Amino acid sequence: MMTRNTDAASMRAGFGFPQSLLRLGRFFPLLLLVLIFAACAPKKKSQGATSSPSLTIGAMSSMDFLPFAVAQETGIYDSLGLKLEIVHFFSANDRDAALQAGKLDGTVTDYTGAALQVAGGLDAGLVMKLDGDFSWMAYGATSEAFPSSFGVSSNTVVDFLTDRFTQPAVAKGAVVHRVEVQKIPLRLELLLQGKIGSAVLPEPFATMAEASGRCGRRDVSSAHHWEATGLLVKRELAQDGNNKALALLLQGYNLAVIKLRDADTKTLARWIKDYAGAPEKLAAHIPVPDYTPATPPKAEELQAAIAWLKQKKALKKDLTPQQLIVPMPALP
C-alpha cells in the first residue's frame, strides 16, 4: 500500500492556488520594481499651463535699455513671473548675427538696423520705441566752424543722424566728409585727439567727450523729438495667444520707468555706471532721458529712416513703416 506524502502533495497543489497564479508570482518582484519606478518618475508638466514664460534679449551698453536692466536687477521680472536673460554685446554685428541665428528673441536696436534686418528677410518687427539721446559733438569746445570731417559707421543710426543734424548746413552748401570708424570707443578717442573733426555719439560717450574740455555739444536728438532706437522682437512673439511673455516684458519696463524717476542720485549713478558703461566719476552727470511707458514707434520716424536707407541704396527691398511694426500687447 502506497503512503501519500501530504506535504509534497500540498506543495504540488499550491495549497489550493491554481498553478497559473503560482507562475505569475515568480514575476511579482519585477512587477513591484516597475511600479516603484513609475511612482518616483517626474511627472510631465504642461508647458503652457505651469512653466514660466521666458525671453532672451540682446543689448549693448547704453541708456536706452536701462529700464530693462533695472527691472531685472530689482526683481520686477521675477515678481511678474518672467524669466528674462539679457545678453550683452560689444558689437552690433555680433548682436544682429545672434538674432538672425535664433539665439535671441529680440534686441535693442536702432531704426535703420531694424529696417535692414527686416528687408533682409528677418521675420521681426519693432514693438516699442526706446528713450536714448544722441549728441552731435565737435572738436574744439568753442569753435562754431563746420567740422572738417565726421566719424561714422556706414548705414547705422549714427550715419543717419549725421545727415539729420547737418541738413540745414548742407542746404546752405556745407559738405559732410565722412571717415569710417565703426566702434564707438575708437570714434571717441579719435575725436578727443582731433583726428576727426566731429562725431555723433550716444550717452555716456557724448558727456565723456564734453567733460574732456576738448569738445563741444552742437546739437542733441531729443531737442528735435527724434526717435532713433527701439525693441525689435520676433513677430511670432507678438501674435494674439502667444504674447504673454512680451506683455510681461513691457509691463516690467513700465514699472522700472517709475523706479528710475523715483531713484535717488546715488542709485541712479550706479545703474548708469553698471549698465550704460559710464565712468564712475561721470555717472552722476550723465543726462538721463525722460523715460516714458512703452509706446509704439512713430510711423513718420520709421519712414524717415527707410527713406534715408533707400537714398543710400542700402535696402534689399521696399519697406513701409507698417512692415517694421508688430502690435503691442495689451498692458495693465
Residue ranges and their predicted role:
Residues 36-39:
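C-terminal motif of bacterial Sec signal peptides marking the signal peptidase cleavage site
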Residues 112, 183-272:
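Pocket-lining segment of extracytoplasmic ligand-binding domains
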Residues 47-181, 190, 197-203, 217-219, ...:
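Short, glycine-/small- and polar/acidic-enriched structural segments
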Residues 4-28:
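Bacterial N-terminal signal peptides that target proteins for export
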